Amino acid sequence: MVYDELTVQFSVCIFSCLHPVHLCAMWLYSLVLCLAGVRWKSTVQFASRPDLPKLAYKRVKGKSPGVVFLPGYASNMNGQKAEALEEFCRSLGHSILRFDYTGHGASEGVLAEGTIGTWKKDVLFVLDELVEGPQILVGSSIGGWLMLLVAIARPEKTAALVGIATAADHIVTSFKALPLEVRKEFEEKGEWTVPTKHSEEGVYRFSMDFLREAENHCVLQGPIPITCPVRLIHGLKDEDVPWHISMQVAERILSNDVDVILRRQGQHRMSEKDDIKLMVYTIDDLIDKLTTMV
């Protein structure tokens, strides 16, 4: 199968790829410490918003382009990918901001009351109020969907995109793919329960109102008006969000600079050491590309 304008890469030997000149001693030292669990801690801050819950975030100031990390559903800013990314950016002197959506982590609000629109507003607030200049948005799972939405809304604040197991439209399309009688049962209950190994309860619960609201934010029905560089990383063993979604996103994005990187052993969270190295090297390559273009 051939995908025009796309580069499909099966990552095998991570250390051999992407600008070895950047692998300086400080960079490697920082990354090794991070993966070993030794980290410089950034301070949690809280952003107040009129009539909206406070957002918790951690920020390291530095050079442009900066990086903003968008976590997945029911996740937070303290995951392995976010921690590793902060250490990497700190070692290069680039700014990074990671945060919790409304109802997630240390932010105010209730998870069950959140919507795709709610969390899109959170990211827009971060871009408008908490960072300066164009950013590299790194979105994991539902964060990958949100990064697409905000890149469309704020092209001037988006330098590049890195999606990890991008879950564009996935909640909506998965529900619609259920047999009609099964959908009707959930609609009568007013709630869709999705089995998951990522929750203590063993399921995620989505209200019918959540699903209806999410339909307003679907992006795969036509061309996606994004023209910045885009990198989409996905694991072939992802049992939560099929890797084909990243291919669909890549096919629809208008940018000519789109790479899809598939990891043969990669699972949904992409939090193994080699997964994290691939993410970091991908961002390193983008930083080099963007700073060279200036």
Question: Which residues are covered by each model-predicted region?
Answer:
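Conserved alpha/beta-hydrolase
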Residues: E86-A106
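Catalytic nucleophile-loop/oxyanion-hole region of alpha/beta-hydrolase
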Residues: H104-L130
